[in-house]
């Protein structure tokens, strides 16, 4: 119901925009979506959801990993295209395998199989850069320390559960522009923060 209310709000109040993909979007500025996790899990009921994939992706985020081999080994395909695109760019194969062509799809499946089976290949080609896992569990501070935001949240929930400062940020502002403009990793996290 809350998700459907959000969609209705966007349709009724949203502004149509053209953005970088030229697909077009309708959006509203800052809609706060609140969910009481004591009562239910916020899973969409309006379409089929690959719940195993959702669970594996969340566990992957929480480990701090940015190499998607674990996801590929567990049948989660949502991140495959990002690594494959990096591979094509760095090996000058973009023209040989035009995006979404039949050849591209066949070669990407071969690429994923190699990732699953070859440790060295996986280490070289399947790191997405400083996305969710790194930002959540190994945020790089100015002084070089790594900050584990998930551990901080867990500690605060045990010791100061009424604090307004219990939140996780997925956007390290020192890296955002680099993530946006560089093509050698995934783009910035979609979910910028949660509280």
Predicted regions and their residues:
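Terminal, non-catalytic protein-protein interaction segments that mediate quaternary/complex assembly
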Residues: 1-195
